[in-house]
From Swiss-Prot:
EC number in record: 4.2.1.113
Residues at the active site: K107, K209
Gene behind this protein: menC
UniProt protein name: o-succinylbenzoate synthase
Similarity section: Belongs to the mandelate racemase/muconate lactonizing enzyme family. MenC type 1 subfamily.
């Protein structure tokens, strides 16, 4: 079912979720939620994203609100803790929000910080969690990444380096130089050809996110063409977007790694009761936002109008596609 623009706007709720610490350069996360006939969907493309890229996120939100979820193969998903680029002294406080979690992803290569800061943070995490992976968000050159790999493994192993460099060619070059597995994120979700990183033998692990890839159906189609392990991660989603990620993870034939779906713990408040990991797992199931929370977290009128205008622009870029759950695709996906 494809909603009209008028119907979509009538079902829209725009909220601002305050964060416990600065993450990805922001302290408040704005998202638009869609109260659809099949459930709730989320449109949360980051504010700086241009309409064509953001339109994939709108497709994902429409699919969740109007489509049918895939059949699941598991009813709970192992998750990793996410540690922002905080000081080493703040690490115990962050990890305390992820009870039972045995894997942590640590942000590194933060602008304004240095490798020594990263080493201190990673070692502080290593004292409390069994398995550590790091995410540079493409912040290093090949040479800097190679040096970081040595420094970050001096006191213990890393599960993998996530997006250490920005380009597929750089990832491939680094992979030839280091023994640590390389994971690709931005090289998949922001690429015109999300499979190029696999064909180039540039990664050992694929980090896939539902919203940037255009929804669960598109996510699963891409995952089916990737012959390396998949890690499902969030895009700093609200509990609504996290739910879509859990459903996608539950539908994968294999799930070898803990997933980055615990980022809800980074928010001070969310639109529904926060999901708490139990023994390092989150349950798979639907979510319904609390009306009181929707109202309390609602944005001022000017911000709501900004999101309405954004939905209008992105919606105008979508084209019908009978093969997708949402019934829509971005123009470049045709």
């Amino acid at each position: 079912m494809i909603p009209t623009l008028t119907e979509l706007l009538d079902r829209l709720h725009v909220v601002a979720l305050p964060m416990r610490v600065r993450f990805r350069g922001i302290t408040t996360r704005e998202v638009a939620l869609i109260d659809g006939p099949a459930g709730w969907g989320e449109f949360g493309a980051f504010l700086e994203y241009q309409p064509l890229e953001a339109s994939a996120w709108l497709v994902a939100g429409i699919e969740a609100a109007y489509g049918e979820p895939p059949e699941g193969r598991r009813d709970r998903i192992p998750i990793n803790a996410t540690v922002p680029a905080v000081s080493a002294t703040q690490v115990p406080e962050v990890l305390a929000r992820f009870p039972g979690v045995r894997t942590a992803k640590v942000k590194v290569a933060e602008p304004g910080q240095n490798l020594a800061d990263d080493v201190d943070r990673v070692n502080a995490v290593r004292e409390l969690v069994e398995t550590v992976r790091v995410d540079a968000n493409g912040g290093w050159s090949v040479e800097a990444a190679a040096q970081a790999a040595v420094a970050l493994t001096a006191d213990g192993p890393l599960e993998y380096l996530e997006q250490p460099c920005a380009t597929v060619a750089e990832l491939a070059a680094l992979r030839r130089r280091v023994d640590i597995p390389i994971a690709a994120d931005e090289s998949i979700r922001k690429a015109d050809d999300p499979l190029a990183v696999v064909r180039s033998h540039a990664a050992d692990v694929a980090v896939l996110k539902v919203a940037p890839l255009g929804g669960i159906a598109s996510f699963l189609a891409i995952a089916a063409q990737i012959d390396i392990p998949v890690v499902v991660s969030s895009a700093l989603d609200s509990v609504v977007g996290i739910t879509a990620g859990l459903i996608a993870a539950a539908a994968l034939p294999e799930l070898d790694y803990a997933c980055g779906l615990g980022t809800g713990r980074l928010f001070v408040a969310d639109v529904a009761e926060p999901m708490l990991p139990v023994d390092g797992f989150l349950p798979v199931g639907p979510v319904t936002p609390d009306p009181a929370r929707l109202q309390a977290l609602g944005t001022p009128p000017a911000r709501r109008q900004w999101w309405i205008d954004r939905v209008k622009t992105c919606y105008s870029l979508l084209v019908p596609c009978a093969g997708d759950q949402s019934g829509l695709r971005r123009p470049r996906d045709r």
